[in-house]
């Protein structure tokens, strides 16, 4: 890892506070534009709420660890940086509130219709694992529904003014459908309806997470272990861990306290052992999370682990939105191939 920005991303992106595992060099006052790039890159990683809060903490308590230069130049630069950071954070929170309100309306109508549906990822993770909507960025509403109830949910969405966006032919076999609606203040609202969180058929042969598996009454319904499986499968199969947020989701859920036996059972049922191992290992390596490390150890032996840890490194994840990201794509595709070899249900 060569970019100072990446070190500060890792240092400032833990919602629980400053990450002591990373002590990057400060920026000289002439490098202040790079701190604006840091805010933008945090936005692309969807970790800006934590970064802005921790940035403020550093600038108040130890500004010389972040910026060096004459005090009369640093003070106005700090003020401008914090003003932009707080403005961006306010926009992130405002959109999260709009999306959460949309999700609540949808879930109320779905419940009245008796539909088997669960709110997943975004607003659910924010409220269940992050401590509130202000602590996690998300850009849409995600609903997981039993396949045979999808048409009825479509009727609910259409009744609220949402329009179905037909997928391109090459994506017709995916288990995700998009619905959109214009909002007077928040642009376009996107709702993604999933019948299986593993969207592509080539990966779905090896792993799967349906509504009934996620919200299994025999395992206590939607538990922290269920959310951790959700976070790992989503980060791995949909995005190949191309944002820090997918690691932080696992980090925050692991901190809730996880029943290791339940986690192992759910991982086997869904085929998620390798994605889960990747998520936990990265949370331990990047953020030093002991809970993640302990859970990772309970999964051993992990199929293809020696190959996996060399492909999906901490540096790869932290660099995934930087200027060299295109050079990293071949390694991500290798990881995707590995997911098809490591059938966790075997």
Explain the meaning of each model-derived region.
Residues 1-139, 145-346:
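Conserved NTP-donor binding/palm subdomain of two-metal-ion nucleotidyltransferases/polymerases, i.e.
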